[in-house]
């Protein structure tokens, strides 16, 4: 074998203990200039660190090749940029250019590419302007990177100027230039211009199709992205590569389209694209956004390689789909792996703790963030505040807000605390904070109004809620379905059912299930069967398989003793394979979480708790408690109804708390559904008889029971 061939096949090429140029000076054969360049090119390809790169740079400087071979100089520049050393890259670029009458296109394009890839738009444009002033030939490799820089920084005007230059130079119909134009116009939101260029292209390769698909996906136009993806394959016969699959998977995830998720996953599997990390991550995220965490976990478990994005996607998928416990278990696996949690991981896990609502878990995770010395930016700070509010520690949330420097608070900071006040029934405090927010010059957004309207609803502040709703129109904040749902809920809870119904009829667009659902809940609270039928009819057209709406209507019928209608609804559910969500409650016991539900035969404390509940029922009756039998939604005898009420999951959890948790320690219970009227009444009596503070978090809000009263003032 030729000596050079032997050297090129040898690994590693660099002796870390000797200068690189010694490899050349000690060689026993004469190199031709061409063979030396090949040698260095191979060294550069295998170079994977800045120290090795500096050795190569030094050797090229010693031999003089750094100035006589622009190609090698360009490769060094590319490598410096790759290792985030743009200053050294630019210094080399300037030193090489001194040796020439004017810069070469290749070197300028290389430096422009380096700047564009890291989003340094103004440096990119300055260098582009320098090329034009010095008469350096601007070609079809220059424009795409200039467009990329403009796209990353949303510079529409500059992008259009460069577009004009490209047309004057005759590159307007070049494939690479057109692909760059599609990208810059799409990212800047100019979809008419973008689509016009795309449609007028004489030839469209995979890069152009992918650019257009990605543009639609990133602009949250998933339907258009999916149509183009199918057209590209079916009409043009082009096979999607990994970049296209990543974009279309994101589009399918935005749509929550389970059927197309299966199709995209199948395509990626058949073409072996799923083995690429970026594709595997996108397929995983797609399934979680479609609500299929089982399929996502299967993808995750089969991945040969995982990075922090893989872990975060799966953790986020569990959390967003209400499987926070699974997220906590997976987080433990992550800590045992080689992958280190990041601030993004922390943000996801704080949300998981907030979803579960257990204070000791939230505190533990907060301690983990501090011990890991993670930077707590405003987003993570807001998430921690939200977590404490949702874990029942409103005082901690308020203190956390006050501890954020005013200059570091954003609208989200205010929104979180307004929402926290609302969840705990402190409507007036929420309104005061809302006023303070505006006084400090922070503009309320649609999230703010959702929080403040909800706070007014839970506190029964009808007039104030109406004013806030009118304020939205004054500030030109777009009215969304969620805002109408909040107002309908507010009016409905106050018994103003007709006004709530009139508001729905006046909506400019068809009401969503959230709006009709708020009305149906109000009808259940106030026993309005006729209006409830109207709400239920609309709901079951929009969401025919939503179990909760069947249950609400069934409860309305049951409260009116319409057992025949109850039976019909239950039969409809059975025929559709729908099951009523089982009520369950959980209680914090030290650092443990215990669950209770009526049919639980395996709870180790079952007999003790049932016995305690029976004694509690007697004590409460002696204090004046009367069971609300309308909450027993079964066609049975009165005494059977009373016995059934005693075994509601939240009552069992509170009975356990009275039995096992030391006096002076707050009893904290979480229920997955709305607490019923009878349990609400019972907890007031228990808090008075035993002088205990009981905090119950149900599906809608917090109830703080103490001394025989509730923080909601019986308005929930």
Residue ranges and their predicted role:
Residues 2-205, 211-716:
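Terminal (and in a subset, N-terminal) low-complexity or junction segments at the ends
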